[in-house]
Amino acid sequence: DANLDHNIERMLEAYAAQTWHTSGYVPKDIEYPKQRQVNKLPVIDHVMQHAALNPVEDDIRNTIYYHCPAGSKGKGTHYFYNLIKRDIFNSPQQDTFYCLPIDIHHYFQCIDHNLLKSEYRRKIKDRKLLSFIDELVDSFNPGIVLGVKLAQLLGQLFLARFDYLALRCFDIIDDPEKFHYWQARYVSDMLVTCRTQQQTQLLCEGVSFLNERFEKFCRHGLHHY
């Protein structure tokens, strides 16, 4: 606080001149809830990253699927818990009978720098901000650093387009050959896997009904989302 004005002026000058360099990382091992290694930075680096991110953060977060609340203001673990609870209580029991937790093993360590840079360039056009983010990304290898807000946001953005593609069944409806192949598989597999009264009722609606149902999945995503 004693040198606040001086530090702010120094940070602004470094940002404007594109001469800012991320400080050295201090690794820290975390054991709970899962074993991983995060990296600590001095306070000045966090202030710099938050300030640089501020003008574009809302726009980037609006790109990310809303079921990814980590690091978002007003969201977090309880927000995600309430989303899951809502789905369970508002959906038929047979539709929520199973829960499959999926995790990308060592996700942050596997992110390719060039692919990540091309991804955030879809949303950010300011040259100085791009230079600042590029420097942060390249300051850690392999992958991107775990333990700073900006890196967490970039990690979510990196998967954003994949999330929406998954919800739309990977846009197979835009490829007639692929769409009709999987539509036929959907109907035929329903015949083989029929186990419940509800599935029997769906089959009794006929092939045309099942074809239309599959098309709705592809156009609008699964109804839970």
Model-derived features: where do they sit?
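Generic preference for hydrophobic/aromatic residues in regular secondary structure cores
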Residues: 20-27, 38, 183, 212, ...
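Conserved two-metal-ion catalytic palm core of "right-hand" nucleic acid polymerases
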Residues: 1-116, 138
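Inter-domain linker/hinge segments that demarcate the starts of reverse transcriptase
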Residues: 7-19, 200-216
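Charge-rich, low-complexity amphipathic helices
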Residues: 74-78, 176, 212
